[in-house]
């Protein structure tokens, strides 16, 4: 799993029938949830993920990939490689809050 930020939505006019009602989002992976890094930063790695939670552009999300992406009730029969499994409210590391739901950061 990794933390990423939704940077956009992907619209397709045709897709695999099993995915007909699926919302797709563009997610950029983040790094920096370590002792030396005071904030989450974009890595430049971008991927497309199925999102059944309704994440919006700018929100931080928890993403899983590979065979684990096909273990949710919704994606069990879909040909997917990445799925949003959570919308991040707060990231805490030891005594620091890296990200709060209101978008503010503290160190």
Please describe what each predicted stretch is:
Residues 18-27:
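Short aromatic-glycine-enriched beta-strand elements
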Residues 9, 30, 66-67:
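Short, surface-exposed secondary-structure boundary micro-motifs
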Residues 47-83:
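Mid-chain, well-packed structural core segment of small domains
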């Amino acid at each position: 799993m990794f933390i990423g930020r939704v940077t956009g939505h992907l619209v397709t006019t045709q897709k695999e029938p099993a995915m007909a009602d699926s919302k797709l989002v563009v997610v950029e992976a983040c790094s920096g949830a370590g002792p030396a890094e005071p904030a989450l930063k974009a890595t430049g790695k971008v991927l497309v993920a199925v999102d059944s939670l309704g994440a919006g552009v700018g929100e931080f999300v928890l993403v899983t990939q590979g065979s684990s992406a096909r273990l949710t009730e919704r994606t069990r029969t879909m040909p997917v490689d990445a799925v949003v499994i959570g919308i991040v409210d707060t990231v805490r590391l030891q005594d620091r809050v890296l990200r709060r739901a209101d978008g503010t950061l503290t160190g």
